[in-house]
Amino acid sequence: MAYPTPESLDRVAVIGTGTIGASWAALFLARGMAVNAYDPEPGASKALQAYVDRAWPVLNELGVIVAGADQTAIDFYDDPADAVRDIAFIQESVPERLDVKHTLFQAMEPGMAAHAILATSSSGLLQKGLRHPERLVLAHPFNPPHLIPLVELLGNELTDPAAVDWCQNFFEDRCGKKTIRVLKEVPAHVANRLQAALWREAIHLVLEGVASVEDIDKAVVHGPGLRWSVMGPHMLFNLASGGKGMDVFIERFGPSFAVWWDSLGQPDLTPQTAAILAEGCRAEENGR
């Protein structure tokens, strides 16, 4: 399949304009593209424009907005097939319910151009029922997409590899994003799994009385969080080897990590746990 170049796109479609879809729309508008939009919720058109208007000053301050970008270049449609007609790139962000998504995809597909790519913000690929499953690509953002650079890209055995390549070029070169390739389907993909692993241990430390909610948050913000904003855990530990490489780091420090891993907790999110964390968060809020 020959797809148009990302640079040639002057209009895209956003299907589902809740928080995630509206954020995508704000980004696409800022990068000089017009947006066809669809959402069946009453008042969705006004809500979308209001979201974009709130986001625009921040995008301008961050230098995201390109010359000629128009924050009002939104056409709202009542029919998803009309919204995607003659559009080369479609970003779908409707609620994560299989029945809703499958019904929507079936309604959209008659209007989709032969070369159109359908990117979904969903947590899994949903190709069942599509006449052209090869053009569905998972493009999972870290919220909100108009501010956080990360997009996780995933295709499976039904996906055209060229469609995934195209999405990488589109998000990076046209939208200024940072993409990673997820090589196999796992629950929550990559970034959310890393986030979940850290939060699990943070909860465990609270429940064990090791530190307060506020101090655990401080430990992340003023410690490893500063490092992680620059580079990831593998490269940090690789550099900690003194230039000798990751294998030397593991040989030297691996036994210590193994002991720490054995002591990591697996807390349950019970009502009691929720109450303890909520109380800790209220205390942290009051201290700010």
PLM regions and their residue ranges:
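NAD(P)-dependent Rossmann-like dehydrogenase/reductase catalytic/cofactor-binding core
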Residues: 2-8, 31, 176-181, 207-208, ...
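Rossmann-fold dinucleotide-binding core
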Residues: 117-183, 188-193
